Design a protein with these regions (language model features):
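Conserved phosphate- and dinucleotide-binding cores of soluble alpha/beta proteins
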Residues: 56-200
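N-terminal active-site beta-alpha-beta segment that forms phosphate/nucleotide-binding
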Residues: 1-90, 200
Length: 200
């Protein structure tokens, strides 16, 4: 119920800041899906582009960024692009992937986004979803990681203690984006939210 209300409020906020020729990047996740589900059909804005902020993770296609991008674009009568790659690959593979023209073009557009919509997760839960091993998860805990957003793991002071390789949005990129919409709620995520938001 809390997440549903947050989704409605976030959709309402997005509706208020939309304008012509605007680029929206969004991550996957249950919270971001709530925004997309609650977004009304809007046709008055022209030249809106919707993009995934990163690749897709997990087995649940319904909450992957590419799926949510297509759904949001449909509601906004907008154009969209997809990023067809697994989110969690190593740096050498990322370098290779970024040389592919079609991916390079999408990534350049992602970095020029006007609005970034993202969820915030608990560090250990997100590490498991991203396929990190128990040893790596233990290392994250030792480093004080409490929250995760766009593949970055944050401690209580909002410092990035670890980040997964990506062709999409990274922590420093997020800071350059004009409007950030973080969607998260519930007591269990309080520490994660404070950690991530201290960075911004």
């Amino acid at each position: 119920l809390v997440l549903e209300e947050i989704g409605k409020s976030a959709a309402n906020y997005l509706k208020g800041i939309l304008k012509n020729k605007c680029t929206i990047a969004l991550t996957g996740g249950t919270s971001v899906k709530r925004l997309v589900d609650n977004m009304p059909k809007i046709t008055e804005h022209k030249d809106i582009l919707v993009l995934p902020a990163r690749g897709g993770i997990g087995r649940n296609v319904e909450i992957q960024s590419n799926t949510l991008v297509a759904k949001l674009a449909e509601k906004l009568s907008a154009d969209y692009r997809m990023l067809q790659l697994i989110d969690n690959v190593d740096y050498a593979e990322i370098y290779e992937i970024l040389n592919e023209e079609s991916i390079k073009e999408v990534v350049e557009k992602i970095h020029k986004a006007d609005i970034l919509i993202y969820g915030i997760g608990k560090a250990d839960e997100m590490a498991r979803k991203r396929g990190l091993g128990e040893e790596e998860i233990l290392r994250l805990k030792e480093k004080g990681a409490v929250g995760e957003a766009f593949g970055c793991y944050f401690n209580n002071n909002g410092e990035i203690v670890f980040s997964t390789p990506t062709a999409g949005i990274k922590g420093e990129d997020a800071k350059k984006i004009n409007k950030l919409i973080a969607i998260a709620g519930g007591k269990s995520k309080a520490e994660a939210i404070l950690g991530v938001q201290s960075y911004n």
